[in-house]
């Protein structure tokens, strides 16, 4: 791989360094996971066996979930948990609470992380999981502050402004000590290309493990192709297709937050529909699940 990288860098001056790095990351991950992702045809018997094993795992697990619990009972009952290779779209208009819901799910999954050692020295997640959170809109510091506020029940604006008393300060300090080692990894790089996002997710899985990816939000991820003639719809379609491919490759669920178009605001009935997905393209085709965040009280207050 090193010789190939050196040769390409020497002979192809047009190739951007970032693309070379992404290509090498892909090759390294493929080498580490040799045989686990591209296995070709499997017999129907093997597929049946795997499906029965999934059902057995759900039967043995508390709550009867075959996937990772979101921490929200009603949602888990509808989805049966979040399953490996699923692309889950969480969409809504601004101020509906998309990021708040996503951070709550991420925190719950990371907080419940349990694993067991395997005979070959690797670890297997038995509950919860390691979370990779790509926050393209909010900084890691802002995200952490939001989690601390949720965990302690102290309003976020009070923490930001420093208008807390000594007791609340102690609560915050104790909370930080309790949750600082959770397996929740935040990447707050803005305008991240989908190729770089995938490379970083592979690296995280290789170094720390990975059970859930969250992307906040879909429309802020950029195309890796940068072709002048591509429309924004084509770019977003490329992103969703690559996120679905990444979910299958890493065998983890991917939650991608998405904005909705302004058409929602012009209707009398503000409840979102699939057609409201902003720059939708192939979002609904690539997604396994599409969920909408809707708060009727928000519109009544206005």
Which stretches of residues belong to each language-model region?
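Short, small/acidic-rich helices and loops at N termini and domain boundaries
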Residues: 1-61, 85, 96, 128-129, ...
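The Walker A (P-loop) glycine that initiates the GxxxxGKT/S ATP-binding motif of P-loop NTPases
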Residues: 92
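Hydrophobic positions on the alpha1 helix immediately C-terminal to the Walker A/P-loop
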Residues: 101, 105, 143
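Phosphate-binding/switch region of NTP-binding enzymes
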Residues: 76, 118-123, 234-302
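Cytosolic-facing regulatory segments adjacent to core modules
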Residues: 77, 112-209, 223
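Pre-Walker A adenine-sensing motif
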Residues: 71-81
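Short hydrophobic/aromatic beta-strand immediately N-terminal to the Walker A/P-loop
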Residues: 88-89, 132
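Walker A/P-loop NTP-binding motif
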Residues: 104-112
